[in-house]
Amino acid sequence: MKKRVVISGLGFITSIGNNTPDVLASLREARSGIEIFPELPQEPGYPRVAGTVKGFSFPSTTFDDWTWPPEYTIERTQLRSMCPHVVYAFCAMQQAIAQARLGPERVSHPRTGAMCASGGSMWMIYEHLHVMVTRGVHKCYPLALPAAIPGTLNSNLAADFKLKGAVLGFASACASSAHAFGYGYDQISQDRQDVSFIVGAEDCNLHSILPFTGVRALSLVADPGKTPAPFDAKRDGFVGTGGAAVVVLESLDSAQARGADIIAEVLGWGEAADGYNVMAPEPEGEGLARAMSSALAAAGVTPDEVDYINAHATGTVAGDLSEIKAIRRVFNGTRVPQVSSTKALTGHGLCLAGAMEAAFTALALKNRFMPISAKISQLDPACVGVPVLTKPVGEEPVVAISNSSGFGGANVSLVLKRWE
């Protein structure tokens, strides 16, 4: 028999808050974390804004120059193999462990692991390759490689928190940490682990954001109050962000035995590939529709039981429309759930997005509200028939879906339920 899986802790370093109370307030009040980002070229034809991470500074690749909020202690021996997003994740992990009330013996246990996702640090890779090319490989920092590669997240967290269970890294572009969440759920529901930390993280700097200008994916709107605008008729692309989110998944048996404060239950998940294009989403939303249908079947939930969808919608014309069509496919002939994209507030966190938005969805369920889709001045007519939330409603959601999609047509849907 499958074990029931719950969420017992959350940790946030995000553009809309660096702790659960601040993130919750931002979601309730539609408080945006988008700002003018001086690292980006402040001239026409370039993105100028980002979902900035406050309270941290990384002026160079020399870790002695880095600063972070004073409530966190990070030893020099730990910093040596880190990059910015690992620092974010280290802090978010401490929050999640504290909220879940996990002691050291439970964290460092053979049945406690972590499922992680990041794109690595393009900034660290660039800077250290520059040293190798201009000065020679023997002038390179010895720990440059483990500090920069995508596996830096899981390897650092495993070492620093003495994790002894299953620790994996995932790479499916912007669906990565949603995949991590799904496979973490499987580890627990199949009784292979008792606890799994789901971690999504990304740098927030020029090197992690600007390259998407080359594929015409980024918004060029210079007003942080107007972009990104998922589902808006005049949306022009996504806005980059970074940070970290940690979700503690735990078996219900383990959480109840410890007297944990349960945030939400995870009912199941689904995944599917578009099989269409290395970058563009399948126009009719067929792959995402299959992921949602698979998730609902695994969760034992019918479409008309779903109250809310936290959409992947990033603010691109093609991506948002594909998701709307996917929702229509799945909820054809039934009550269509309320839909919103919290990326209007945070920006798009790439490999961070899935874990971050699943955590947002869990918070919304626990606190009985649905975040709105902000910055919509005129709803895209293509969304007609799908109730995109542009203002708060009194309905209290019980069952919700969190969607994620990535380059190459990777699609993941997670089904969560309010804990009663």
Regions found by a protein language model. Give the residues of each.
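Glycine-/small-residue-rich "gating" segment that lines the acyl/pantetheine channel
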Residues: T134-Y141, G182, D186, Q190, ...
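Condensing-enzyme catalytic core mediating Claisen C-C bond formation in acyl metabolism
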Residues: R4-S8, R31-I36, Y46, D223-A299, ...
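ACP-dependent fatty acid/polyketide chain-elongation machinery
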Residues: M1-E75, D253-E265, A359-S373, K417-E420
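Active-site pocket-shaping loop/turn-to-helix segments
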Residues: S15-G17, P21-D22, T73-C91, C140-I149, ...
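Active-site-proximal alpha-helical scaffold in enzymes
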Residues: A89-L102, P150-L153, A158-F161, A166-A201, ...
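Conserved small-residue
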Residues: G9, L27, M93, A114, ...
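Acyl-CoA/ACP chain-elongation machinery
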Residues: P38, E43, R192-D236, W269-P283, ...
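Conserved beta-ketoacyl condensing-enzyme motif
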Residues: I7, R28-S172, A201-I209, P303-G319
